[in-house]
Design a protein with these regions (language model features):
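Glycine-rich beta-strand-to-loop/alpha-helix junction loops that act as flexible
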Residues: 10, 64-66, 89
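ATP/NTP phosphate-donor binding region
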Residues: 1-61, 71, 107
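Alpha-helical membrane-targeting segments
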Residues: 26, 148, 158-183, 231-261
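Glycine-rich phosphate/pyrophosphate-binding beta-alpha loops
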Residues: 144, 148, 205-221
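ATP/nucleoside-binding phosphotransfer catalytic cores, i.e., glycine-rich phosphate-binding loops
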Residues: 190, 198, 224-227, 231-288
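Short glycine/serine/threonine-rich phosphate/pyrophosphate-binding segments
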Residues: 46, 68-73, 94, 120
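Catalytic core of DAGKc-family lipid kinases
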Residues: 5, 31, 40, 78-83, ...
Length: 288
């Protein structure tokens, strides 16, 4: 690690996190690393600055934030030799938990200095944008289709800071409980090449990591960033109680099966959606 950029959102985290970021930067400078901090104002700017870091010869880009910031940085450095490093400044920090990155930014900076870069497979989503144009993006943690995706779409970036955490979670719960669970078609290939078609899916998650941290121990048992596929969670029930039972199973670390929820490994998944499920596209491809 010689030449790095640290990308962060100055509107997120408050004064305390800015102080932690400055302390982490000092750790890098004290180790002889050429490091600079770049403030960003939007997801698109994070991705653009990450791409600039690649063209300017940086060997590492630090995502200083949560999983959303990591996602934006990955869009800019995927398929390049530039390494991703993390200073956990977000709310959930799922990828940091899975990688066992220290959650204090200064400790995370020290850990990055002694770490060795390694390649992992990325998930890729191909879809049609809201403007009707073909688009794609990469994901590291998970991708989803259904009510969870609707929730994240509605709870746009920055809402936590505007509403406060209590109001944010209240809004999330209201959206999740009131949004109609519609069925869509999922076709995926199993590791042995067998193609499976499910015509009654109400919720789909494609998960790349094992540990999400916090109270959620395992959302998708069998998922691993060391594999070259995703772990699918297919909910085939319109009952929210079924999905809640499955999530509760992960909260307590239990291994019991939940009727109406299936798990599978796959490298290629195709979803055919009713427009009411997702207004952005009627066809989504997920690859790993």
């Amino acid at each position: 690690m010689k030449n790095v950029r640290l990308l962060y959102n100055p509107r997120s985290g408050g004064k305390r996190r800015h102080t932690q970021l400055d302390a982490a930067l000092a750790v890098l400078h004290d180790s002889g690393v050429n490091a600079s901090v770049i403030a960003t104002q939007s997801s698109d700017e994070v991705t653009a600055k990450a791409r600039e870091a690649v063209t300017e010869g940086c060997d590492t880009v630090f995502a200083c934030g949560g999983d959303g910031t990591i996602h934006d940085v990955v869009q800019g450095i995927a398929r390049t030799p530039v390494a991703l490093a993390i200073l956990p400044l977000g709310t959930a920090n799922a990828l940091a938990h899975d990688l066992r990155v220290p959650l204090h930014p200064v400790a995370a900076a020290r850990a990055a200095l002694s770490a060795h870069p390694r390649q992992i497979a990325l998930g890729q989503l191909r879809y049609v944008s809201l403007q009707g144009k073909p688009a794609n993006c990469y994901f590291v943690v998970a991708a989803g289709v259904g009510v969870d995706a609707h929730l994240f779409y509605k709870l746009q970036s920055g809402m936590k800071q505007r509403l406060g955490m209590a109001a944010y979670y209240a809004k999330a719960w209201h959206l999740w409980m009131t949004h109609k669970m519609r069925r869509f078609v999922v076709e995926y290939s199993e590791p042995d090449g067998k193609v499976v078609t499910c015509s009654d899916v109400t919720e789909l998650l494609a998960v790349r990591i094992q540990h999400f941290g916090g109270v959620l121990k395992e959302l998708a048992p069998g998922a691993s960033r060391d594999r070259n596929d995703v772990r699918l969670v297919l909910c085939r029930s319109s009952s929210r109680a079924v999905y809640l039972r499955y999530v509760f199973r992960g909260l307590v670390g239990a291994q019991w099966k939940v009727s109406g929820v299936e798990l599978a490994h796959s490298r290629e998944i195709e979803c055919t959606l009713d427009p009411a499920v997702a207004t952005s596209s009627n066809r989504v491809y997920i690859e790993a």
